[in-house]
Amino acid sequence: MVKSIQIEQFGGPEVLQYKNIDLPKLNPNEVLVNNKAIGLNFIDVYHRTGVYPIPLPSGIGLEACGVVEEIGSDVTLFNVGDRVSHACMPIGAYAEKQILPGEKLVKVPDGISDEIAASITLKGMTCEYLLHRAYAVKKTDTILFHAAAGGVGQLFCQWAKAIGCTIIGTVGSDEKIEIAKKNGCHHVINYSKENFAKKVMEITNGKGVDAVYDGVGLKTFEGSIESIKIRGTLLTFGNASGVVSSIDPKKHLAPKAIFITRPSVMPYTTIRQELELSASMVFDAILSGKIKVDIFKQYSLEDARKAHEDLASRILTGPSVLIP
């Protein structure tokens, strides 16, 4: 038996249960991973609350780093003792050990700690596809990133700065302005005090930005549309403030011929070669210094409720992990 966080109903942090579970036998294509560190991500809150419904009862968590303890008979990509990380289904990373499809794991290079790998695989690959594939950011671009002081935002802005584009970031408090600037933003707007769309237009001399990266959702959607230039792109990749329930092509898209996409990491890493390329780009960005990662806070696995309280209240201003 192994310790795991399980949920039997959707709700607040109180639905997270720290309990023993039995693991099934390995299928031929599967790997048993002994988790050393587990990533905390806002999508875990969506799964816990039912914003993104999952079958119940269920484990929770999509990201971890650990050591291969056992491999199925058909697994050829890994050996016992390899350090690996993942950011994928099946859900259940909040556990001492987890069984995963071998094709969903990636090797972690020397020079990257378990804690950093666990905190960077999902967020890092999210930044990779947002910057390079969902919309290929160019040096000449001006872009807007919402929640620039958040976990994804800090990594994204560092990486975008290395490309050489101009970055406008939004934050929800004055305390987070310096965090956003430290991580690469050229301009920072506190959207709790200012009309960010109006400010973006001032910064861009009325032109608007080439692309808006919006993981906030409901509260920022209309302003994001206003902030985009003619034939610009809106990448809506999260719903931290609530889900955008409807988009009116005539109202929202037609006036400026805006492109809109709703990307997520899974469709960009479904093919094994894409998964390996994305992970290698993330790890290379860390090892080369393009991205600097400092673990903000560590929690024990049994303190997952407290971790979720902090995650939902937005007091975690950097990558944080659970330690089994």
Residue ranges and their predicted role:
Residues 163, 171, 219-291, 324:
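Glycine-rich phosphate-binding loop and adjacent beta-alpha segment
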Residues 196-206:
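Short amphipathic alpha-helix with an adjacent loop that forms part of the alpha/beta core around
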Residues 22-39, 49-92:
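Glycine-rich beta-strand-centered segment in the early N-terminal region that forms part
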Residues 46, 86-147, 159:
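NAD(P)H dinucleotide-binding glycine-rich loop of Rossmann-like/cofactor-binding domains
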Residues 258, 290-297, 305-324:
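C-terminal capping/lid region of NAD(P)-dependent oxidoreductase domains
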Residues 120-193:
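Mid-domain Rossmann-like dinucleotide-binding core that forms the NAD(H)/NADP(H) cofactor-binding site
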